Amino acid sequence: MNLTKLYQSKHELWLKVLFTSFAINDEKLKNTIYEFAMIEFRHLKWLSNNLKENNISYNYEKYAIEIEKKTNFEYFEYLINEIKLCVKNYNPEEPIFARMISDEYYFMNLLGRLLQDEKNDGEVTAFDKSRTFGDKELDCKSRDALTLFLFEESYKEYELILLYSYFQNYTQDILQYNIYQDMIDESQFHLKSFGNMMAKMGILAIPRTVIEQLYINKDIKQFLIDGVDEEIKAKEECANLAAAIKDEEISKFLTCVMYQEDYHIVLMKKAIKKIELTK
C-alpha cells in the first residue's frame, strides 16, 4: 500500500476509534477509547508531516464508514480487526511505523482484555433514533432545533480539524502554527461534546467527506476572513438555541460554546494580521 492510501486508511481508523468512543455508554470505557482516538490523530499528524517532507500529496478522501454496532463487545472486536488491517501495511523498519505498531498492539491487547470480562459488555443506543436526552424533557421544537444543530456543527468541527491540520502542516510561521493548534484543540473538544450528545439522542453519524477545494491551494487569509463571519453566525446560533431549549444544563453548555467562539475570532484575526504583515 502506498503512503497516500495508507493515510486514507489511518484517517478512517481515527474516525472509527473516535466514533466508537462516542457510541459506548460506559463513561470509563468511553474515556479509554477516546484517549486512543487522540493517539490515532497524532499518528495521522505525523504521517501528514512525513508525506509533506517527501513531497507526496495527500487529501481527506475516505470511504463510507459503517460504524453502527449493537453492543460494546461488537465494537471491541470491530476495532481489533480494523487495526490489524492497518498494521499489516506498516514498514516496521521506519521509526514512525514502529511507534504506530507499538501503540496499536497495546490497544489491541487492551481491547482483548476488555472482551474477557462480561461486565465490559453493554447495549449501544447511539443509533436508536430516540431523540431523547437522558431524563431531560425536551419539547418537540427543542428536539428538532438541537438535532439540526448537532448534525450541522459536528460536521463543521470535523471539517475545521482537518482544514487547520492541513494549513498547520504547510505553514512556516510559528504564530500561525500555534493558532492552528489552538483551533484544532477547540474543535476536538466541540466534536467530542457534540458527538456524545448525538449518541445520547440516538442520532450518531459519521460526518460527510471534506472536499479538496476547501483546503488544497486555498487562500488562507480569505479562509480566515470568511471564518470570522462563520464564527459570528455560530455565536448567534448558539445563543438562539440556548434561549430556545427548555433545559438549563444544555443551555449553559451552549452559552459556554458561544463565548468560546468569541476567542476563536480573536485568534483568527491575529492570524490574519500576521499573514498581512508577512506579505
Residue ranges of predicted features:
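Non-heme di-metal
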Residues: M1-K279
